[in-house]
């Protein structure tokens, strides 16, 4: 066994745990879990343990991650992610994804948004492999353990790079809400181009957001908060909501308290900086 890297030992607890979860994931990832298949004949699934899914805190969005992505939104097979909303008689989805959590981390926001917006399909996008696996296993367990009430059928996660391939997944004006919760601050000046909010990326976000759709941002890094606010305020298709709106918005309350990063900041008595922006209609062409 290599003590420096227990993942190389095929008999280590972490490797055995991941192997077991991977087999379970292959079996249940795209299965329509309902009362007829209730919890694998009554068997409950344990929620995944985060310590077995260790990965670096951040990932380089410009690297070649060998990701699978559709060539266009029309080629995206949503039935695999949301089988409960697939109509086999028509061969079509009964709903479209309308809420996206970009860089969803360990899925805390997805889990809390699910019961708050039961009529919406909610997708998390995460670039890190093991973190994505953790969220997949978490959703599988929640769907299975709550199959009788059809809970958590409206959320799922994909491994994807939103900075490169977002328009490959979503049609124009498809989304009503986009969340950017505690993104990588990329402190060094030369890495600012890798931040998730830039002028170029905001135009892509505006493309997939419908009129009056909302971009939600939260961070514990004031410099990053100021950066995101500056770029959003400078973009002609976004307008900031005032503090009163933020204080009364249900999503802001969930966003402040649901994510793992948010809970960590809370434990450390840190600050959380929130900014929300409305997607303006395209200007009329005279």
Curated annotation (Swiss-Prot):
Record keywords: Methyltransferase, Nucleus, RNA-binding, S-adenosyl-L-methionine, Transferase, tRNA processing, tRNA-binding
EC number(s) reported in the record: 2.1.1.33
Gene: TRM8
Domain of life: Eukaryota
Main function: Catalyzes the formation of N(7)-methylguanine at position 46 (m7G46) in tRNA.
GO MF: tRNA (guanine(46)-N7)-methyltransferase activity; tRNA binding
Gene3D superfamilies per the UniProt record, alphabetical: Vaccinia Virus protein VP39
Subunit: Forms a complex with TRM82.
Location in the cell: Nucleus
Principal subcellular localization: nucleus
InterPro entries: SAM-dependent_MTases_sf, Trm8_euk, tRNA_(Gua-N-7)_MeTrfase_Trmb
Active-site residues, as the UniProt record annotates them: 184
Residue sites binding S-adenosyl-L-methionine per the record: 103, 126-127, 161-162, 181, 259-261
Coiled-coil stretches noted in the UniProt entry, renumbered to this chain: none
UniProt similarity note: Belongs to the class I-like SAM-binding methyltransferase superfamily. TrmB family.
Pathway: tRNA modification; N(7)-methylguanine-tRNA biosynthesis
Record field: catalytic activity: guanosine(46) in tRNA + S-adenosyl-L-methionine = N(7)-methylguanosine(46) in tRNA + S-adenosyl-L-homocysteine
PROSITE patterns, sorted: SAM_MT_TRMB
Matching SUPFAM superfamilies: S-adenosyl-L-methionine-dependent methyltransferases
Record organism: Vanderwaltozyma polyspora (strain ATCC 22028 / DSM 70294 / BCRC 21397 / CBS 2163 / NBRC 10782 / NRRL Y-8283 / UCD 57-17)
CDD domains: AdoMet_MTases (cd02440)
Protein name as it appears in the record: tRNA (guanine-N(7)-)-methyltransferase
GO cellular component: nucleus; tRNA (m7G46) methyltransferase complex
């Amino acid at each position: 066994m290599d003590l420096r890297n227990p993942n190389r030992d095929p008999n280590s607890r972490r490797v055995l745990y991941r192997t077991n979860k991977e087999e379970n994931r292959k079996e249940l990832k795209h299965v329509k879990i309902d009362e007829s298949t209730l919890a694998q004949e009554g068997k409950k699934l344990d929620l995944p343990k985060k310590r077995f899914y260790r990965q670096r805190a951040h990932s380089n969005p410009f690297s070649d991650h060998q990701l699978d992505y559709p060539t266009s939104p029309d080629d995206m097979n949503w039935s695999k992610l949301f089988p409960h909303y697939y109509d086999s008689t028509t061969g079509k989805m009964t709903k479209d994804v309308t809420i996206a959590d970009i860089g969803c981390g360990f899925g805390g926001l997805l889990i809390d948004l699910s019961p708050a917006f039961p009529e919406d399909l909610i997708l998390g996008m995460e670039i890190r492999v093991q973190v994505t696996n953790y969220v997949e296993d978490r959703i599988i367990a929640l769907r299975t353990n709550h199959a009788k009430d059809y809970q958590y059928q409206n959320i799922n996660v994909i491994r994807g790079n939103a900075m490169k391939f977002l328009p490959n997944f979503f049609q124009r004006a498809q989304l009503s809400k986009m969340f950017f919760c505690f993104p990588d601050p990329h402190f060094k000046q030369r890495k600012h181009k890798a931040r998730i909010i830039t002028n170029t990326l905001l135009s892509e976000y505006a493309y997939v957001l419908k009129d009056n759709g909302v971009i939600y941002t939260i961070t514990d890094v004031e410099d990053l908060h100021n950066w995101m606010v500056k770029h959003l305020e400078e973009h002609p298709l976004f307008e900031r909501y005032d503090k009163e709106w933020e204080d009364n918005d249900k999503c802001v309350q969930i966003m402040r308290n649901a994510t793992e990063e948010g809970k960590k900041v809370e434990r450390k008595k840190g600050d959380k900086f929130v900014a929300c922006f409305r997607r303006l209609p395209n200007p009329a062409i005279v």
